[in-house]
């Protein structure tokens, strides 16, 4: 191996062994357990975030942690926001998935600090409830029934979640909700409706489709990014 190749190899190895990164040279991104997929370049993901999302939206985020966490295993999820920080599983499919996970959890952080700005005028709430009503109509027309009261609940409800993903099934739900929600996960609760929309806003190349499908949500997120 020549000297140039050796230097490049050593630099790449050092990057892979690095356990501390920063977003906007300010927010620590700490690696508790190395990302299992060696093809994922965390620096690329963080750079993309810095290029696409306004820095001020991260002002209330304390840190990002990547690794194996009991909280993730208990909920059977890849990411979670809690106590001012984002926790991510080190088992990531690819850079796109990691990017979206960080954005999604950032949205939950924003909910915590801008709840009145996001939900105060109830426009998103009204839009979400109307979509839930459309969902009920479609599912019942396909002979899929549950307690009607569940469609009106804004918070996450385990019974409704089990109905959607076990009784209806994710694949079928995705097919039936194409013209209602940006993704099936957005139907689970108001908070996920917002976070899923925020994720799409900064990763989807079809803003016109988003704006047409969820106009109130699109406008709210757009306004939030301009504060």
Predicted regions and their residues:
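Non-catalytic architectural context of zinc metalloproteases
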Residues: 1-36, 62-70, 99, 165-178, ...
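A conserved beta-strand element that flanks and buttresses the S-adenosyl-L-methionine
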Residues: 102
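Low-complexity, serine/threonine/proline-enriched polar segments
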Residues: 124-172
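Alpha-helix boundary/N-cap detector
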Residues: 37-44, 151, 155-158, 212
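Auxiliary, metal-adjacent structural segments of Zn-dependent hydrolase domains
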Residues: 16-99, 120, 140-148
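Exposed alpha-helical structural elements
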Residues: 41-48, 52, 124, 134, ...
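Catalytic Zn2+-binding segment of zinc metalloproteases
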Residues: 105-125
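Pan-zinc metallopeptidase signature
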Residues: 156-227
């Amino acid at each position: 191996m020549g000297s140039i190749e050796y230097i490049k190899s050593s630099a790449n190895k050092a990057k892979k062994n690095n356990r501390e990164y920063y977003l906007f040279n300010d927010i620590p991104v700490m690696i508790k357990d190395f990302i299992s997929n060696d093809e994922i370049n965390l620096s690329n993901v963080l750079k993309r975030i810095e290029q696409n999302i306004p820095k001020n939206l991260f002002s209330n985020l304390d840190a990002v942690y990547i690794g194996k966490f009991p909280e993730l295993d208990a909920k059977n999820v890849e990411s979670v926001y809690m106590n001012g920080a984002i926790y991510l599983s080190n088992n990531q499919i690819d850079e796109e998935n990691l990017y979206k996970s960080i954005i999604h959890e950032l949205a939950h952080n924003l909910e915590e600090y801008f709840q009145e700005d996001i939900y105060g005028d109830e426009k998103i709430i009204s839009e979400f409830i109307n979509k839930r009503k459309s969902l009920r109509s479609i599912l019942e027309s396909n002979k899929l029934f549950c307690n009607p009261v569940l469609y009106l609940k804004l918070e996450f409800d385990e019974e409704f979640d089990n109905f959607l993903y076990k009784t209806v099934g994710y694949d079928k739900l995705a097919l039936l909700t194409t013209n209602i929600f940006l993704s099936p996960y957005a139907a689970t609760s108001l908070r996920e409706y917002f976070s899923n929309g925020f994720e799409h806003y900064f990763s989807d190349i079809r803003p016109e489709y988003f704006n047409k499908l969820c106009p109130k949500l699109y406008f709210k997120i757009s306004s939030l990014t301009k504060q």
